[in-house]
Design a protein with these regions (language model features):
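S-adenosyl-L-methionine
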Residues: 2-81, 95-98, 102
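A short glycine-rich, Lys/Arg-flanked "PGG" loop and its adjoining helix->strand segment in the class I
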Residues: 155-165
């Protein structure tokens, strides 16, 4: 890393901290402060906390692995984003949704997460809460998320039960459950959706892109 880059990152981190630190837990803020600069040039996948901060600071396109940029490109190609959307697991700072909102020509984006505390952010609608199968999704055209961990199962079941499209980039943690390996987890998800599809007539795909680390799930009519 050049000295110029190091200084620029420290400046952006200082500005970011001043503006947003009050919305973070102590441990999450410490993680961002410790890793924002020294992980910027990593070629591995980066924690969501850092992705949110880099996106807000306009740094995502400089990352070796721009996960948010890739996800936005794919969801725009694979889905119609012009409608009322719900992002589940947006994190502390919902910068992915803010960037996606700029690509919409109509519609709204609502973000939902139990850790979100910021009252206003761009043109987004904000819900502090945990997504469950009982969450009212009747107003949304599409539910989406990146690496939502424990919300994955609820998002899938909600999509089928409420006949709402889903676009989901899986994480690598297998939903916190103990599977023999990640592929066993994928087989479990596929079997679950096959059963739900047979009951509802809703279609699904599990697929991969080379610029995203884990598979994606899409449900649709």
């Amino acid at each position: 890393m050049t000295l110029e880059t190091h200084l620029r990152l420290n400046y952006l981190l200082s500005q970011y901290k001043t503006k947003y630190e009050k919305y973070y837990s102590k441990s999450d803020l410490e993680y961002v402060m410790k890793n924002f600069v020294n992980r910027f040039e990593d070629r591995d996948c980066i924690n969501n906390l850092l992705l949110q901060a880099y996106e807000e600071c306009g740094l995502s396109e400089e990352l070796s692995v721009n996960l948010y940029g890739s996800f936005i490109n794919h969801i725009r190609t694979d889905c119609d984003i012009n409608g009322d959307l719900l992002e589940v697991g947006c994190g502390v700072i919902p910068s992915l949704a803010k960037s996606l909102k700029r690509r919409q020509t109509s519609g709204t984006i609502t973000v939902m997460d139990p850790v979100i505390k910021i009252p206003e952010y761009g043109d987004l609608r904000i819900i502090n809460g945990t997504f469950t199968e009982q969450t009212d999704v009747s107003k949304y055209k599409l539910i989406y998320g990146t690496f939502p961990c424990e919300a994955t199962s609820a998002m899938i079941h909600s999509s089928y039960e409420n006949d709402v499209d889903l676009y989901l980039a899986l994480c690598g943690c297998a939903d916190g459950k103990l599977y023999l390996d990640y592929y066993e987890y994928l087989f479990y998800l596929e079997d679950t959706m096959e059963t739900l599809s047979n009951k509802t007539g809703r279609n699904f795909d599990i697929f991969e892109y080379s610029d995203l680390p884990y598979p994606l799930i899409k449900t649709y009519r």
